[in-house]
Amino acid sequence: MLTNLFLFFFCRCNAFALFLKNQRRWVSPALKPADITAFHEFCKKYNYNPRTEILPHGSYLINLGNPDAAKREQARDAFIDDLRRCEQLGIGLYNLHPGSSLGSDKQETLQRIADGINDAIKETEFVKVVLENMAGHGHIVGSQLEDLAQIIELVQDKARVGVCIDTCHAFAAGFDLRESTKFTAFWADFDRIVGYKYLAAIHLNDSKAPLGSKRDLHQNIGLGFLGLEAFRLIVNKPELEGLPMVLETPEDAKLGHDVRGDEIKLLEWLVGKDADDEEVLAKSKALQAKGAKERAEHQKKYNDKLEKEERPKKRQRKLFE
């Protein structure tokens, strides 16, 4: 049951994520008392603090920004149910994709999202809603730091709201984290626009797609367009120390969850390392070589997409000439 979701991880990591129910169904059976007890026992046995070290991921169905009132109400009910499950388990953080405007006015969408959070906070006691930054595809909101800041501004109880930065999503949205100067600039902007006091978690993912692609395509650490240096910078940034950092990287079909264990060891190994460390440079080069073919494939797809988008513009220019 619930505890089986993290049996693969407890010997290797000190934070983890899970789903509270079937993430692709609106309604799921209530948590069984035996599962709740077992969850608490496992957390105690393996020294997890559920208030600060466990980050459940919200259902993919939930869209608090939906302009359709009936569908938005359905999303709110599912959202509140998730938060209540967190509190049954003693979990203090809950990760949420902000939502989509579905083509409606963006400012009204942000208000609807905040209204949904405010309603849920009134119905629950302590769990913090952690808004995740998004890649920027289509009408999804949350790819810009200003989106997250505006939602937070509209939330009444600001002690109950925070932010999770997903490295793949940030990169896909156009934030370059690959070298020190730009990495530092991103976090300076984050502190100015949102504020470190709201930073509650990190999702550690490399990116299969290029910078600014708006594609939410996670890759294993060091194999993608972000590369190893971005993660060296992250694990050595003092302001991020102590936050739950969750890997959402692809599983290897042969190794299964073991690939995550290897990535955890790699990230721990990077702590205290400098950018010019010969071992780090060699490891980075090896990982980039391993991921080169897949990067080339996605770069071509992205280039083809840009070229396709440019064709109507070229034809339109000719018509006006």
Label every model-predicted segment.
Residues 149-167, 171-321:
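Histidine-acidic metal/acid-base catalytic patches
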Residues 27-35, 66-78, 104-115, 139-147, ...:
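Alpha-helix N-cap and loop-to-helix initiation/capping positions
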Residues 6-13, 32-55, 80-90, 118-125, ...:
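Acidic (Asp/Glu)-rich catalytic clusters
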Residues 1-7, 74-83, 183-190:
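Short, acidic/polar
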Residues 18-108, 245:
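Structural motif corresponding to the early beta-alpha repeats
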Residues 1, 21-23, 59-61, 99-101, ...:
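Active-site beta-loop-alpha junctions enriched in small/polar residues
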Residues 64-162:
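Active-site acidic/histidine proton-transfer and metal-coordination neighborhood
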Residues 1, 16-18, 52-58, 94-96, ...:
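Hydrophobic faces of well-ordered beta-strands that scaffold small-molecule active sites
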